[in-house]
Amino acid sequence: MHNNLVILAGGASSRMKKEAVLDNLSAEEIAQANERSKGLIGVGASGRPLLDYLLLNAKKAGYKNIYIIIGEQGELFKEFYGSQNLNNDFHGLNISFAVQYIPDGRVKPFGTADALFQAVEQFPELNTQQYSVCNSDNLYSAKALLALRETTSPNAFIAYDRDALEFPSERISRFAIAKLDQNNQLLDILEKPSADVLADYKDVEGKIRVSMNAFKFNGSTLYTHLKNCPVHPERDEKELPTVLLNSVKEHPNTTLGIPFSEHVPDLTAKEDIADVKAYLKEHYPVLDWQA
């Protein structure tokens, strides 16, 4: 089992910065949503950020080395998790920071695949090891994170049952869906699925599976695909699902979809803040690092 978890936190958070359609937020919450990276918004006990809870679950799952990919203006992460670039001790986790630099000529970061490529360039030891990757603005369970550590598949991702996600149906319908074979090996990822093709994408349990960006990768075989990832024609970004599919084309039967049926709290927009706060209050009344 590997001990490395890379957390994607360098994005532009553009949807979070849009004006809220609800009026259930305080002035402080609105200010944080507009100014902070999503994972640093204070939705938890005593105003602690969502990322605390993700790190807690990572620790419970047995991860030791955490690499947080931050943007060029990501100094606030260091106020929360350690002032050094390398080897900060946060409740027994070893936290280091990679920086996703924005290329000349661009205003926004170049996508999740670019973020991970910059991270493995800055921490080349990852290219000879296995590691997990996830978002900073989702709260994955310790059980799901442990499944990524435990799998013997070279590459893997958590394949969530779409029906178990507690989001509005309109939002869920926009999620990309994964096509798996009878052994749960990844065959394809379909973006913006239309209702008429959904039946073709059901797995052996009859479930529609979606990815929430919780991955496990073999560093040595993934590197080439990260380096050569093409730009998505519509979104003008380099994205991890593209890397995954290119890897599958070259190495079939090496990317396992691990079936899970549970909700994954998500901080995408201001409308999510109250829901995530309520979820944490119910499921994590205390941030207990000793448990």
Model-identified regions with their sequence ranges:
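Conserved core of the sugar-phosphate nucleotidyltransferase
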Residues: 141-224
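Conserved alpha/beta core of the MobA/IspD/sugar-nucleotide pyrophosphorylase nucleotidyltransferase superfamily
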Residues: 189-291
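Hydrophobic packing residues within well-ordered alpha-helices of enzyme cores
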Residues: 16, 77-81, 148, 226, ...
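A structural signal for short hydrophobic beta-strand segments in well-ordered beta-sheet cores
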Residues: 40, 177-180, 257
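Conserved beta-loop-beta/alpha segment of the NTase-like Rossmann-fold superfamily
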Residues: 92-177
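Conserved N-terminal catalytic core of the sugar/cofactor nucleotidyltransferase
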Residues: 1-7, 13-31, 44-130
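Cofactor-binding loop segments of dinucleotide-utilizing enzymes, especially the Rossmann-like FAD-
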Residues: 8-11, 71, 136, 160, ...
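Phosphate- and divalent-cation-binding pockets in alpha/beta enzyme and binding domains
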Residues: 76-79, 143, 243, 275
